[in-house]
Amino acid sequence: MQHYGVNGYSLHAMNSLSAMYNLHQQAAQQAQHAPDYRPSVHALTLAERLAGCTFQDIILEARYGSQHRKQRRSRTAFTAQQLEALEKTFQKTHYPDVVMRERLAMCTNLPEARVQVWFKNRRAKFRKKQRSLQKEQLQKQKEAEGSHGEGKVEAPASDTQLETEQPPGLPSGDPPAELQLSLSEQSASESAPEDQLDREEDSRAEEPKAEKSPGSESKVPGCKRGSPKADSPGSLAITPAAPGGGLLGPSHSYSSSPLSLFRLQEQFRQHMAATNNLMHYSSFEVGGPAPAAAAAAAAAVPYLGVNMAPLSSLHCQSYYQSLSAAAAAHQGVWGSPLLPAPPTGLAPASAALNSKTTSIENLRLRAKQHAASLGLDTLPN
């Protein structure tokens, strides 16, 4: 059971006469001990207390004392003159300092606290009005943009229809990397035989009145027309070197179609006929009494080992081994037209050049020309 203290007595005791008598006696004793002391609310009789307040007020007063009720303030009613003075000050500044508020309070006959609260409420009202104006402006802008956007939507719609009806052509951007790589490989493979032909033509131009036969010319365009196909079954995967010496990235073949044994033999036979005619022309024009010119022509022939890799490192090793064996078998036929028998009385240096060295030089020249006709580029050592 809860007890609500009233000077040490419970509320239930107030219902009895003895409780009221004790309260009255206690109040009388306090008044006697302190004559100048005002008697408290508890010293009043129950009839006096009930006459001025309700039972709920008695309970609240017993619980919290006589000052339990919150003092309520009535709403301040500003006059027209007070509102005019306050509005003029608000137009000058929204945050008046203490001095300005005190002067305004003296002019309007209002407490300074009321002036301060009025400015606080006035600032809140001003911010609310500003927000409403901003919302209205945004709404108007959206409506204006919507009206303009409706007119613009029709024009882009027709443009998109034209774009969809137009067939998709080649992409305007850069070509794919695979296409660029294949084009670069093809250009490199086509430029390599051309550079080889230029070097051969320069070396042949140094020889007196050397002519190129039509048989050897007919081989090279066929090789240049072929595009590199790395996935062809019979092609030879060789990484050619550019004239500057840099190796290409992916390995690709030098021929577009597989090289059959019959085709190799036919090309070699035609090419040998062309080179034999060339050698015969040079030997006839040099003549018998001038073997030194023939030796110079043989010396002018480029050495195969300078620009070509060893035959053992090539993929067509067996073919070149058979080629060298055939060249050794026909050593006398190939070596006789280039250098005739030197007459007696020549210098010892020209006599020391025997037929074996001449056959090796001829073999290197023919192997190099045959590789150029097939489109095989030179490889560094």
UniProtKB/Swiss-Prot annotation:
* Residue ranges flagged as DNA-binding region: 71-130
**Any coiled-coil regions, as ranges:** none
Pfam families annotated for this entry?
Answer: Homeodomain, OAR
UniProt cross-references to CDD domains, sorted A to Z: homeodomain (cd00086)
Major location category of this protein: nucleus
Organs and tissues of expression: Expressed in adult brain, stomach, and testis. Expressed in the developing diencephalon, midbrain and hindbrain. During limb development, expressed in a temporal pattern with expression being first restricted to the forelimbs and then subsequently to the hindlimbs.
Gene3D superfamilies named in the record = Homeodomain-like
Alphabetically sorted, this entry's keywords are: Developmental protein, DNA-binding, Homeobox, Nucleus, Repressor, Transcription, Transcription regulation
* InterPro entries to which the protein is assigned, alphabetical: DMBX_homeobox, HD, Homeobox_CS, Homeodomain-like_sf, OAR_dom
> PROSITE patterns from the entry?
HOMEOBOX_1, HOMEOBOX_2, OAR
One of the GO BP terms on file = negative regulation of transcription by RNA polymerase II
The Basic and acidic residues compositionally biased stretches are: 133-153, 201-214
Give me the stretches of Low complexity compositional bias: 177-191
Q: Where is this region: Interaction with OTX2 and is required for repressor activity?
A: 1-156
Locate the region Disordered.
129-250
State the span of motif (OAR). Answer: 358-371
Q: Quote one Gene Ontology molecular function term.
A: RNA polymerase II transcription regulatory region sequence-specific DNA binding
Q: Where is the protein localized?
A: Nucleus
Q: What does this protein do?
A: Functions as a transcriptional repressor. May repress OTX2-mediated transactivation by forming a heterodimer with OTX2 on the P3C (5'-TAATCCGATTA-3') sequence. Required for brain development, neonatal survival, postnatal growth, and nursing ability.
Return the similarity comment.
Belongs to the paired homeobox family.
Q: Which PANTHER family match?
A: DIENCEPHALON/MESENCEPHALON HOMEOBOX PROTEIN 1, DIENCEPHALON_MESENCEPHALON HOMEOBOX PROTEIN 1
| Name of the featured protein | Diencephalon/mesencephalon homeobox protein 1
**Gene giving rise to this polypeptide:** Dmbx1
